[in-house]
Amino acid sequence: MDKRKIKKSKEDYLEAILIRINKYGACRVTDIAEQMGYSKASTSVALKKLEEEGCIIKDDWRVLLTDQGYAIASRIYERHNFFLEWFQCIGISKDIAEADACMIEHVISDESFEKIKEYLNQVREK
């Protein structure tokens, strides 16, 4: 499998966990599977890898983010929300903005993202 696909998948899982915890205070394997549209079995396999990488901790019924997992998830979630809002502000439909934000959040470099944010903040201040 392509490294970018693995990275995207990992980031999507971590982002889904973060969103679920922020919204409901807890997150279960079944919640993640439902949210992402995957089977519980394939979700469990992916979460096992994330646990081995030190990104999550699983107990009997819930999934928690480690500091490392939280940092990755927060970074991706910030990018997603930034691009979603920006795209909608410039007139892109919500569905297309959502899809494009979801793609860009995984591939844009930290440097490019920060420069775009700085530029748009300067434009807003004028």
Task: Annotate each PLM feature.
Residues D2-Y38:
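N-terminal helix-turn-helix DNA-binding core of bacterial DNA-binding proteins
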